[in-house]
Amino acid sequence: MAGLAEQGGDAALPADAAERSRLAALLRSPRVLGTLALVYAALPALLREGGDGASRLRTLAAAGALLGAIPALALARRLARPLRMATLLGGSILGALLCVTVVARAMGGAPRMADLVSLPLLFPALAFGAAVTLLLTALGAADEDRETLPVAAALALSAIGVVPVASAIGRDSASGWFVGMTLYWMLGGGTLVLLALAASRCLPRHVDRLTSAVGHGALRIPERWFVWGAALLALLAAAAITVLCFARQPHNADEVAQLWHARILLEGRLSLPVDPNPEFFGMDNVIDRGRWYSQFPIGGPAFLALGLALRVAWLVNPLLLALTIPNVHAFARRAYGSGTARAAVLLLLASPFALFMSASYMNHVPVLWLVSVALAQLAVWHEADDRGTAIRSAALMGLALGTAAAVRPLDAAIVASVMGVMQLTHVRHSAVRARSLVVQVVAGAMPVGLLLLANWRTTGAPLRFGYDVLYGSAHQLGFHADPYGTQHTPLRALVFASKYLLELDVALLESPLPAVAVIVAGLFVMRRTSRWDKLLLALVAAQLVTYALYWHEGEFRGPRFLYSALPAFVLLVARAPFLVAAATRGTMRRAALLVLPLAVVAGWSAWTLEASPVGRLRMYLGASPMTRLDPAKIEREAALRNALVFVSESWEAQSLRRLWALHIDRGDALRMLASTHPCAMRQAILDEERTPARQEGRLARIEATLKSYDPLATPSEACIADLLSDGEGVATYAPFFPSNTIEPDGRVGGNVVYVLDLGAHNEVLRTRFGDRAWYRFGPHLRRGDPLPTLTPYDRSGARDSAGTTR
């Protein structure tokens, strides 16, 4: 009996061991680990106490855990397998605590050790650390056959492009819109993922037939028809947006300044002599000291001048977007194959960011096209096995990047640096390619030489740009006081980088899926990177870091400072479904191929949502009619002949222009106007305008007047009248300024001259324009009218130098 018992016990041991082995295997399975990661990531949300401050702590802890995992991952790969999870966990927790500590100190706080081990911080740090560790373990990120680069890139992009760091650190309204978008992504994106999984699980054959039919159908279209058909659709879509939403008019100071400079170029000049009355033509980003021209490099205005010569300046950027599509396809086809290339073309065609930005006069669009040319030729150069092909592609690359430098030098330097490093690592294997680099440099030097010549003729020095003329050294990259007196710090740079990616989450697709999260998903499952993957990631990183170091926040219909890297972002998004499908099987594989197309279709089908392409169209169409003012139409309908039109802007805008006319720097003018009492500023301007020749010490005198003003004193009747004058109706000078005609002598003239309304100071123009019919554009006929009106000029409505009406 004892023997039987012993035999029974011995027989039971393997069964128990097998059970334990199965349990261990289950706990190590990617699905279980991934589920646990989601659970741990959601746990900090259970801590509701602490309000907004605790929410910021949780956000920073999440970002820190992701960033801390990057060095921990590099270390874990070198350790034995049992130590890897502990290393990842320790690195993630330490990263969370360090992130909160560093940010708190940068914001002026002084966290103590007791704060670091308190529940509101320690619990999120532990939970997010565990979540990141479980996720990386589920993905096998520390395995020997995995590269660290794609996972590290995914962690970094997640930390600042998915986790809303900008909302946690910034002091603006970024958090409001992102909270709404997060809810939209969780509900909309979550629903799409569940639908894709359900369809893939319940109807696998139907899903396979659908994806196969769509894929093969797209590939059956002849390449030329597919590419140029997409280009034509992009041209028509962008042109329609330009006409319907924006009335072919400029909508910010950058567009206005470059259109004006384009008119100057069209007259065969690089600049104009300064107008005798510059205060009446004051415009941001326009230089009117020594010579009259814009702050922008000559290339952007040159592109617009070509359009002005054909009377279709508004069509230049839509056309350049259309020409970008064949280049993106050519690069992607050589780098990744026809499937990814066609997916990238469709994504670029459906991207609201690409379409709305190209429906403008901004110089980012020419650079996008030139970068796409360089990328397409880089792929050709890389495959070239004969001297002629290598030299031809190198010459085109150099010409494209050199021309880009004449438009946006910083963007061109970023792209040229990244591409140059890749080329230098490749020329070792080919003497033909090595010699072609000389041709590339020479070709690039030609447009750069024209840029330097234009600088010399305008600013007085080849390496001095218009930006430096307006803002001096405060315009440069780095951490310093910006032209408006705000310190650009590493923390502010981090906020900018995060905000650009968060804006790209929305703008790139305007769909239930955040764009950066799609890229992250693809990177997490990428086992090895090709040279082209490294190139795209380097372009994204270089563009993001460089513009984070720039003091000005670039937002215009999306994160415009990332627009030059749009091909890289689009290709990374287009690659993601294929990467996830290749790394999975069965239901997950089918769902991976469904989710992104469903999201794009859902975005364009969401007619009632503001966060959609159609919602954006509706917003622009419903904007104030002021945004679609057409000076040519106003001139035609009013039958103006030999006229002078005073455009009445707000009192604040008038004050800014008058400060510029007094030779106050743009930054100082805006800083003083934003921080002082309007009546104090009015008095300071009047005092200086009485002695216009006393330029020396002017800024100090104005600041002394502003400091001496008593804000509790009763404002003068004249000041109150000035401030109330805005209620009579105001307009914007922006669309009118570039509509002026330049005479052969370099002076403003033509049938109609548009100037700023500066009140009684307008009378100084009697000698110069006294033979013209005078009008004022600004007052409303009736209160509540949506548009200003054009009325004959009434001298009795002007205010004299003391501010009283006469």
Residue spans of the language-model regions?
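Membrane-lumen/periplasm interface segments of multi-pass, membrane-embedded glycan/lipid transferases
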Residues: 3-6, 19-26, 44-66, 104-126, ...
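Hydrophobic, aromatic-rich transmembrane alpha-helices
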Residues: 65-79, 128-142, 197, 323-326, ...
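Transmembrane alpha-helix segments characteristic
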Residues: 91-98, 153-161, 228-239, 348, ...
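Signature aromatic-anchored transmembrane alpha helix within multi-pass, membrane-resident enzymes
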Residues: 223-228, 441-445, 449, 571, ...
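Transmembrane-helix motifs of polytopic, lipid-linked glycan transferases
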Residues: 314-336, 373, 377
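Transmembrane-helix signature of polytopic, membrane-embedded enzymes
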Residues: 325-352, 368-369, 386-392, 396, ...
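Perimembrane helix-loop-helix junctions
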Residues: 377-391, 413-448, 452
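Membrane-interface helix-loop-helix junctions at transmembrane boundaries of multi-pass membrane enzymes
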Residues: 387-391, 426-441, 519-540, 553, ...
